[in-house]
């Protein structure tokens, strides 16, 4: 085993592991951080969506009921995945990726994919709509873990180790850009580079790749008025505080109003139709307003604990595949959280990305359930 994510862990063959890991306990620190984020998320989604539900659905409890349903579904998914033998995950990695790519193609078909906000990203499932890009992220991590673990002797070579994975990465990215979904494309690119490095690729190769990504990314932004407006609003939101910069300005006002202790739960003003997407992409700003700096620190601590325990699982895993899988899923989960928080505090352009386990949303919650369930399964079989 030569991957950086697992270089300290000894190898144990798959046949020595049971089909279902019933005798091992999950990582309770990992589980506790997840439950803490879920609990805070339920409270804040209810608070943020109360008036929105009353105005949009004539039912103040409409959105929180749906969120509770999403959490229950994600919890069931996480429970069953936490009992799965990682060897089975390795077997289904490639078929699962093909299934995810099929859904990305399906969403582009008129009449099947739904258009919202100028993007065709959703498939209607009756009571709610499903966003395939949210599922694609963890499935691509699963694929990378399987593929990289089988090519350890070639990872120092660009042509035979790095390039094949980059070519494969372009398939979901091109489908996502057709929706368009620039945020999910950026996340998959970021996670791929991180996992290539963890899998043993040369830093010089990845650094050159990072530089090579800049020109096409800049071209995509420059030739898309919508994305260009987001970037200009990010650079100077106060130039157009009632237009393109409105959302970011309102986010700043939320944090400024909250101070250290916050205005108090339920006492925030931004949820009264001032801050767009306050229950989804900008829920961190509402936490800052009502719970203050202390509430924001609590969120960061929970994600910090999740990151430390997830990476601990990666370094203590018994083989290369599970080590890379734990590393990739942890990096994906925490990376998305940092991107969301970075947008809310004005460090990054707006991307339309939810805060995992906290924001409202069925697709993101199911994706989080998938990630958490697999991490718990990996923690069961990691060395203590």
Q: Where is each model-derived feature located?
A:
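A juxtamembrane structural motif centered on a specific transmembrane helix
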Residues: 1-20, 338-384
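N-terminal membrane topogenic signal
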Residues: 19-34
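Hydrophobic alpha-helical transmembrane segments of multi-pass inner membrane proteins, especially
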Residues: 30-47, 53-247, 285-343, 370-374
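Long extracytoplasmic/lumenal interhelical loops at the membrane interface
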Residues: 259-294, 317, 321
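Glycine/serine-rich anion-binding loops at beta->alpha junctions
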Residues: 126-136, 178-180, 259-264, 283, ...
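Short clusters of hydrophobic/aromatic residues that line enzyme substrate/ligand-binding pockets
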Residues: 123, 155, 162, 260-261, ...
């Amino acid at each position: 085993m030569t991957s950086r994510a697992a270089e300290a862990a000894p190898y144990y063959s798959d046949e020595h592991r049971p089909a279902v890991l019933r005798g091992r306990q999950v990582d309770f620190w990992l589980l506790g951080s997840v439950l803490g984020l879920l609990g805070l998320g339920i409270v804040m989604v209810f608070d943020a969506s109360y008036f929105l539900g009353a105005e949009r659905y004539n039912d103040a409890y409409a959105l929180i009921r749906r969120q509770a349903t999403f959490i229950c579904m994600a919890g069931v998914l996480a429970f069953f995945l936490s009992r799965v033998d990682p060897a089975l995950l390795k077997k289904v990695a490639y078929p699962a990726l093909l299934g995810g790519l099929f859904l990305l193609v399906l969403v582009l078909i008129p009449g099947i994919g739904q258009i919202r906000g100028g993007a065709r990203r959703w498939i209607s499932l009756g009571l709610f709509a499903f966003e395939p890009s949210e599922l694609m992220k963890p499935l691509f991590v699963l694929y990378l873990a399987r593929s990289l673990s089988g090519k350890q002797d070639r990872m120092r070579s660009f042509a035979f180790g790095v390039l094949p994975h980059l070519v494969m990465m372009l398939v979901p990215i091109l489908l996502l850009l057709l929706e368009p979904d620039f945020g999910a494309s950026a996340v998959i690119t970021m996670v791929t580079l991180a996992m290539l490095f963890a899998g043993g690729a040369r830093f010089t190769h990845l650094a050159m790749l990072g530089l090579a990504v800049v020109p096409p990314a800049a071209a995509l932004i420059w030739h898309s008025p919508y994305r260009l407006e987001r970037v200009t609003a990010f650079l100077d939101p106060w130039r157009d505080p009632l237009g393109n910069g409105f959302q970011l300005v309102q986010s700043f006002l939320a944090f400024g109003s909250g101070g250290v202790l916050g205005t108090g739960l339920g006492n925030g003003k931004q949820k009264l139709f001032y801050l767009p997407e306050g229950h989804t992409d900008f829920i961190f700003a509402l936490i800052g307003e009502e719970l203050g700096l202390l509430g924001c620190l609590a969120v960061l601590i929970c994600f910090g604990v999740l990151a430390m325990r997830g990476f601990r699982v990666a370094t203590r895993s018994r083989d290369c595949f599970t080590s890379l899988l734990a590393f990739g899923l942890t990096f994906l989960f925490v990376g998305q959280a940092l991107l969301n928080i970075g947008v809310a505090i004005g460090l990054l352009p707006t991307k339309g990305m939810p805060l995992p386990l906290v924001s409202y949303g069925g697709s993101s919650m199911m994706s989080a359930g998938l990630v958490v369930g697999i991490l718990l399964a990996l923690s069961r079989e990691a060395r203590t």
